[in-house]
């Protein structure tokens, strides 16, 4: 049986990937209720954005794939680097420095824990031959 995954992607988020990865690492592998609680009380700029993305992925799973909300967990979540917007910062004597405003692409995949159990059972039954 193929596992059903629900996915949500946020692109061109104006948060540096390094800062977004700090928040993303907190919720990897957690169930949805735990992840929402963690994100609600995390005092980082990326936390509300990732919470909104998590809620979007949950809605995709419940409405499109008809999965049970209580059995969902974060299967994988990662942050890729987006565009770098180059801006000038004025310095002394008419010179300037380049500032790179970094953006992020955040991908979140959730799946049902029943899918995980059935795939483990299939692997175990297949290895006993």
Curated annotation (Swiss-Prot):
InterPro entries: Ribosomal_uL22, Ribosomal_uL22_bac/chlpt-type, Ribosomal_uL22_bac/org-type, Ribosomal_uL22_CS, Ribosomal_uL22_sf. This is Large ribosomal subunit protein uL22. Part of the 50S ribosomal subunit. HAMAP family: Ribosomal_uL22_B (MF_01331_B). It comes from Onion yellows phytoplasma (strain OY-M). This protein binds specifically to 23S rRNA; its binding is stimulated by other ribosomal proteins, e.g. L4, L17, and L20. It is important during the early stages of 50S assembly. It makes multiple contacts with different domains of the 23S rRNA in the assembled 50S subunit and ribosome. Belongs to the universal ribosomal protein uL22 family. GO terms for cellular component: cytosolic large ribosomal subunit. Keywords: Ribonucleoprotein, Ribosomal protein, RNA-binding, rRNA-binding. One of its GO terms (molecular function) is rRNA binding. Transmembrane segments: none annotated. GO terms for biological process: translation. It holds the Pfam family Ribosomal_L22.
């Amino acid at each position: 049986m193929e596992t059903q995954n629900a996915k949500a992607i946020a692109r061109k988020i104006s948060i540096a990937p390094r800062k977004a990865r700090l928040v993303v690492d907190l919720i990897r592998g957690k169930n949805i209720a735990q992840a929402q609680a963690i994100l609600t009380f995390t005092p980082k700029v990326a936390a509300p954005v990732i919470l909104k993305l998590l809620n979007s992925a949950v809605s995709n799973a419940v409405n499109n794939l008809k999965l049970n909300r209580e059995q969902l967990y974060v299967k994988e979540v990662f942050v890729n680097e987006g565009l770098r917007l180059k801006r000038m910062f004025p310095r002394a004597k008419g010179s300037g420095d380049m500032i790179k405003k970094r953006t992020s692409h955040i991908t979140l995949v959730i799946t049902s824990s029943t899918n995980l159990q059935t795939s483990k059972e299939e692997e175990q039954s297949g290895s006993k031959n």
